[in-house]
């Protein structure tokens, strides 16, 4: 069962825009499978689960979020069959990577987003860094309206946050104190309803409810992610 599911996932990523499935070793075959972890990978997990169910209707597959840290800790504890994460097992404190199998299945782009009424469509990487470290606190400083910047960060344990900070922040820099949320969907909803707000989400969650932000003139598109023109992934 384990090999079959992972095979389906690997085929699926040809059409998807890194993340990984992490499996506890020596899992027995079974008719019920639980996948928990990264909300960035949740749309992929749900799509694969739906496809698998059509071919194997006797199998129950439960897909839940919770964040990369939760996925790793739950699969290590044997509470779930598959943990999804957009960090490797050896990057998470408290996880014994030697007891888990890492399986790379996708590259997930990360997109800065703002409230669509703000009027900001492009930032430099330096400006993004200064916003998330609290050096820039008003949108007027980057060509926007005279409006305080409200930073919404991802929670500790989020693989998306780890990837974002590794790319945007320099060593030794600390993110500004801010409200933290543990799911892409919640972040998007807050940005949609909060003038002056900025955060970041996985590419799979991007839609016209929020304004995506280009970086140094490069737009967050599937083509730019796959050709490595887009810096956040």
Can you annotate each of these PLM segments?
Residues 2-233:
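Exported/periplasmic ABC-transporter solute-binding proteins
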